[in-house]
Amino acid sequence: MFARLMGLNVMSPGKLQQLMQKQPVSVLDVNSRQSWLTVRVPGARPLDAMGYDESDLPADRDSTLVFYCSNFMCRKAPNAARRAKDMGYRNVYVMSAGISGWVGASLPTESGEKRGA
């Protein structure tokens, strides 16, 4: 909802899953760390929505970045995505349904600690 109003590209959970099967995608979870530990999109990295800098993102500005938060009413993912676009990233998306939409679509999830996170 907010992502479209901000002029950002929006991606559905199903489309994200398809994209992840075809090419490398940086999936960025801007929910709380506790939420990330509880349930997340497979391979998603935790990211502080407004406290991140360029070193937290891929060096290649053509990388595909997909941000998500809790649900379609959450503003953290659109704000973080806008920030990435302002840094010069060209392929930036918001999964506006958030993790609740991903889970609601019965897509696979991960939980718990992950090496390197």
Model segments located where?
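Flexible, polar/low-complexity N-terminal or interdomain linker segments that lie immediately upstream
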Residues: 1-35, 110-117
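N-terminal-biased segments
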Residues: 29-49
